[in-house]
Amino acid sequence: MSKRIIYSCVTLKKELENVIAATGFDGEVHFLSEKLHSSPQTMHQVLQQHIDEAAPDTEEIIICVSGCGKSTVGLKATTAPLALPRTMDCIDVLLSGSGAKRPEGAIFLTDGWMNFMKASALNHEKMIAEKGAEATAETMRKIYRGFTDFYIIDTHTYDTTPVKEYIMPLVEMLDGTLNYIDGKYQVLYKLLDGTRDKDVISIPKGGVLDISEFDGLRPAVIKK
């Protein structure tokens, strides 16, 4: 068994499992709690603890969490080299290798993100049941101001129909549009097959992940 360890955002679970099967990765795989998404500081602390507690013979720790909320900035490779995707967030991870330009002012979904939304305070289905459709629509228009374009990222690892059925009521509330975009998640293949190029951040043992590793990457932009 490999002495490599993966710690991944749970929203990438199906895609990562597909890459594991394709590459034959045989190391440890751990999925982080979805609750960490709402607290970058806690995400950072949890990741650092996992790194610090890795076995002395660990060859590499692969962190499938990117620049999300700067949660990975400052991570110290105390026990083993680190490898991370050079991306702003999980959306960029999923779009990597597809050749698609990330649309501005857009909301992106997969089944993983749908499940995250359902468990959050922004679950429109729950809000409709509690407040009614009209009050929910008013609230959502305030929350999603500037965002009307929705994209389902089709990574061909799940059925997109339930995602469409879930999100369409929200799209209609916002007078928005729903489109599909292809997701190749190529950087996950690079992380697992050992490719270390410009798309991968490599931190040697004893090093620290500096914020400059994300220079040139563009955060989400609200459409004018």
Language model segments and positions:
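A short beta-strand-loop structural module common to alpha/beta enzyme folds
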Residues: D26-T42, Y180-K184
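C-terminal accessory domains and tails appended to enzymatic cores
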Residues: D182-K224
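Short, well-structured alpha-helical segments in soluble
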Residues: Q45-D57
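Long, charge-dense
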Residues: T78-H124
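Short, charged, surface-exposed secondary-structure boundary motifs
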Residues: H37-M43, I91-S98, P162, K190-L191
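N-terminal basic/disordered segments at the start of proteins
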Residues: M1-T23
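Gly/Ser/Thr-rich loops at beta-strand to alpha-helix junctions
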Residues: Y7-K14, L36-H37, I61-V73, M88-D89, ...
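Active-site rim beta-loop-alpha module in soluble metabolic enzymes
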Residues: G105-M173, D182
